[in-house]
Amino acid sequence: MKRICKLILVCTIATFIFTLPLGHAQENTAGKILILCYSRTGNTKLTCEALQKALNAQMIEIKDLTDRSGAWGGLTGMLNTLFNMQTSIEPEHPDIASCPNIILASPLWAGKLAPAIRTVIARNTFDKNKVIIFTTGNAILDELNQEKNKAPVIASGGKVVGYFQVAVQEKVNDKKVDRPKEKVIEDTLKLVPEINKAFSSQP
C-alpha cells in the first residue's frame, strides 16, 4: 500500500514538473501577441483565426488596397512580388508598440511574402518586438528562402525568433489539390506550443 502511495505521489510530482514550463510559457505570452495577417484567398486568414484563439492573441487584418481578385489581380500581385514592389495598405501603421510579440502572417507568392506584408515591414519599425513569420503556401520553403523572408524584418530592427509554415495544398495523383481545411487547421494548431516557446525562450 505504501509503495502504491509513493508511486502515485511520484507520478503527481512528475506531471506537475513537466507541465509547469508549458503553462508558464502560455501565461507569459497570453494577451501579448499580435497577429498581422494578410490573406488573398482566405487560407491565411483561416489559420490566423485558429492561432488567435489558441494563443489568446490580438489580430489585425492587413488590407491590400490594390484589387487582387481574379486572375488579373493574382498576376499583378505576382509581378509586384517578383520586383519587390510595395503596395497601398490599410492600416499602414498598425499599433505594434502595445504587443511585444508579433506574428507576421502571409501567403507565399513566388516563395516571398505578399506585397501587403512586405509593405507593413518596410513602413514600420520592429526594434521593440520579437517577431515570428508564419506563411501558408503550396509548398514548404527551405531554410535559405526562409532567411530571405526574414531579412527585411531584421533590417527593420525586429528580432526574428521563429519561422513557421503550413502547406495548404498537397499532391494527389501528380496533381496539386487543396488540402481539407480541417487538416490545415490541425497542422496550424500543432505549431502553438513551439510558437509559445519561441516567444518565451528568447531574451
Locations of the language-model features?
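Acidic helix-start/capping segments at beta-turn-to-alpha-helix junctions
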Residues: 62-74
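Bacterial N-terminal signal peptides that target proteins for export
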Residues: 1-10
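FMN-binding flavodoxin-like domain, especially the glycine-rich phosphate-binding loop
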Residues: 12-15, 19-34, 38-64, 78, ...
